[in-house]
């Protein structure tokens, strides 16, 4: 494992403009896929919070356009926004916690299959 990491570091340090061999590219891809698990709770909670806030604002706009004389309590209008902000805050806390104490979930290399045709560059395929 340590030999593979040192091989990856040597290839990255010595050949920044050339593409590494397919085995190293595969390992780099699996490694980046494993790092994505830290940002997933942050992305889900932020997009969920933003989506709920957008839908609420759209509904409030339609309601206000159809009944302009009806006024609601400020807390009733602000509650969904407060809930969405709380959801995004929880996602940020989860992201911070998971980045400091990562889960021991990894993607097995056997499950991640990349065909060799996709890993070769177009310049190598053309005669």
UniProtKB/Swiss-Prot annotation:
The chain crosses the membrane at residues 42-62, 78-98. Keywords: Membrane, Transmembrane, Transmembrane helix. It comes from the Eukaryota. Its main location: membrane. It is a multi-pass membrane protein. It is found in: Membrane. GO terms for cellular component: endoplasmic reticulum; membrane. This is Putative uncharacterized membrane protein C622.02. It comes from Schizosaccharomyces pombe (strain 972 / ATCC 24843) (Fission yeast).
